[in-house]
Amino acid sequence: MSQGNMTGYLPGDPRYGLSGEALRNYYRAKPAQWAIYCWDKPGTQATRRALLPNQKRYVEDFGERVIGYGHFVSDDGRDTLGTSFFMQLDDRAAADKFLADEPLNKAGLYQRVEVHRWSNSFQKRQVDYRRKGLQQFLCTGPKTGTPEFFRAHLHAHESYFAAYGDSFIFFRGPIRSADGADNIGTALLLELPDRSAADKFWNEEPFAKNGGYQKDWHITRWVFGD
């Protein structure tokens, strides 16, 4: 394998051999996808339970545009902290409309909402995933460092992810800039035995262990919404 490929994506990845402007154009050309995180206001559990069937029906109506749908929970799994949606929608206006019409948001349940342009590297959806009955964790974080830093660690990063194989549930992928061109963060979903396994995954990941993420990264326990 050439040294150029040893510093990049692995064979079989549609990004294999791409870098610089060619890689940015690859992301620009992909259909827009969105990671939407909604965090509940305190004391709204009863309202959430009452409106949850409406939310499920709302999400189901989007059919194949739903990449994933689930809820943030406490580490012990007892308390629901919010909801996340991973959607393929035409543009930011469509993402904003999706959120504006979402039943729990319309009811004023959320304390904070985050909408991120995102790209699913796996091209799979939640319905395609065979569940293993373990715990799920969403790992997110904004990236820091220079493009040179990420090029230096990219092959190790991709090889590390490949070693985890089917621990990734149905997606992993970068948070993108508004136009989709630039890699500014990450969002990935893992199924692992427990929180300590999720912490180990993150702490040993090549970008993370070399300071590639800002300090406000998060590992949050997650459950399927369907």
Question: Each PLM stretch: what is its role?
Answer:
Residues 2-226:
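Conserved, structured core segments of small domains
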